[in-house]
Amino acid sequence: DKHWIYYPEKEFIFHRNFIQSNISPYLAPLGTSSITCEISYSPYKKIDKEKIVERVVNDLILANYIDRNDEILAEDIVDLKYAYIIPDIDYKSKIKKVFDFLESNHIYSAGRFAEWEYYDTDDAILSGKRTAEKMGSG
């Protein structure tokens, strides 16, 4: 029934899992689940990309999300090098200059990365809606 599960424990490689099939049964084939495991890394916190799937599966078993005998039907790795915003002390004034320039050229920003905000899914949808309204009125 949960769709976002956080794992602060250091024993798990992932820190957040998104279970799409708990949002809608249409997001996975009948009788199966769909899960995204979010893993952060940096030059200071390295991961072994060759063994990442094996580690994730083992950690999902450890977290009692899957059973050792469960069949994994598909796997995919998406590496987002710049997935998290890391602001500096003056980032708001810098971003305002960029946004002002873009909007003066009728370029509109929408979403988590474009707006430099930490958005959940509902916030991202509302951001897109606001941007669409802005574009429609311009």
Language model features with spans:
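C-terminal segments that line or cap access tunnels to active or ligand-binding sites in enzymes
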Residues: 1-108
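A conserved FAD-binding loop/helix module that cradles the flavin
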Residues: 102, 107-136
